[in-house]
A protein has these predicted regions:
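Structural signature of hydrophobic alpha-helical transmembrane segments
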Residues: 60-72, 113-129, 175
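Alpha-helical transmembrane segments and their membrane-interface exit regions
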Residues: 67-75, 129-138, 178-188
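Membrane-proximal helix-loop-helix units in multi-pass membrane proteins
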Residues: 108-156
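Terminal transmembrane helical module of multi-pass membrane proteins
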Residues: 147-198
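Selected alpha-helical membrane-embedding segments in polytopic membrane proteins
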Residues: 40-97, 103
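Helix-coil boundary and interhelical linker segments in multi-pass alpha-helical membrane proteins
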Residues: 47-61, 111-122, 162-171
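Short, Lys/Arg-rich, polar N-terminal cytosolic tail immediately upstream
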Residues: 1-28
Length: 198
């Protein structure tokens, strides 16, 4: 979900002299929907396919699918206008902060993988929660409630689904994640349109 800044005429060397508050204001102007769109598509496909494949297959699909979210999001960013890898786009400190937050979330997989080796049914629980953690620093950076809502609702919803639907965990957890993504996408797009109109 790394975003590009609208201050495209600023070079990285010049960026160091821009006050953090100005960098934050530039960062807040981003749309932020490419990655959630990718996540929605992937988790919907995982939930739909789960009843028709073996437990081993869905476990692999969870790893592969969630790993593909970044690449799908990067591709979608060219359709949404976010253009993650545009050469003229200036990156700022908040882009880097979000990227570091994403790496931090991925490092927690060091806990999830050994646990999954003991009990593969924990994979949708752990991946679903870990992948949602990066919304917290985003919420702080853009000074908007949606990231906090996303992480908290997703986490509690996933835990509830994991306990309430032991025979359909992937389907239930996917449904929770997709529902939270839909709310997040609508909110982010409304936020972006509001910023654009001002």
């Amino acid at each position: 979900m790394e975003q590009v800044s609208h201050a495209s005429s600023i070079t990285p060397a010049q960026n160091a002299s821009i006050p953090l508050e100005q960098q934050r204001e530039d960062f807040k102007k981003n749309r932020f929907i490419a990655m959630p769109l990718a996540g929605t598509v992937v988790w919907a496909l995982l939930g739909i396919s789960a009843p028709f494949v073996s437990e081993l297959t869905i476990t692999w699909l969870l790893y592969i699918g969630t790993g593909a979210i970044f690449y799908l999001g990067a591709g979608l960013s060219y359709l949404t206008g976010e253009r993650f890898f545009a050469k003229k786009a200036a990156k700022n400190s908040f882009d880097r902060l979000f990227f570091v937050g994403m790496i931090m979330s991925l490092m927690v997989f060091a806990i999830a993988l050994p646990v999954a080796a003991i009990d593969h049914t924990t994979v949708p629980l752990s991946i679903g929660i870990l992948a949602g953690l990066m919304w917290m620093p985003l919420s702080w950076a853009i000074e908007h409630w949606i990231g906090y809502f996303h992480t908290l609702t997703r986490t509690f919803g996933i835990v509830a689904a994991w306990y309430l639907f032991p025979d359909a965990r992937v389907e239930a957890i996917s449904a929770v994640i997709v529902a939270v993504y839909i709310v997040s996408l609508i909110t982010l797009e409304r936020r972006f349109q509001s910023i654009k109109s001002n």
